[in-house]
Amino acid sequence: FAITYQVGGVVLKKEILMVHNAPQVLIRYTLEDAHSATLLRLNPLLAFRDIHSLSKQNPVANTQVEVVDGGVRTKLYPEFPYLYMQLSKPANFGGAAYWNNNIYYTKEKERGYDFQEDLLSVGAFEVSLKKGESIVFSASLEEANPKNLAKDFTKFLKERADRNSFEECLQYTASQFIIHKAGETRIKAGYHWYDS
């Protein structure tokens, strides 16, 4: 999945990849065009919740981060695992924690579910990019090796099956309903917003 943003003379491409059978999302940002070096600011917004509820601003969320190789890790609530947020090249991380309130989910409202959520920012990454340069952001429940993130993104992208025919689309989609979790293999009997 890719989105290209264009503001003035700056063109930034964002590619999002969920890693198959791993609790990790990789996002590659490429500065496709710019008149000069550009400062990219990444401000992750965190929920730390299950799929059936939405986050609301509260005083018990832990806003502290711990430095890890290439980024930080955080755990908003004791019952959740750590979230590792890392980059493929050195970046500055800082800023005060704050709540971004009343995020509006149109599809959830259409389905008749709660549709407004408060998301916590524990800080932001800042990194300078030159024209043609890329950086990969990883969010994972496991610590990654930042030196491998760019290579891993390219490898995982190449592993994606071609979907040029109906049969290829069906095979690819069917594989998404096979879940390997905690040493068990399950077949998802519905959409992912239902409990597995």
What are these regions (language model features)?
Residues 1-196:
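Acidic, mature catalytic/reactive cores of soluble proteins
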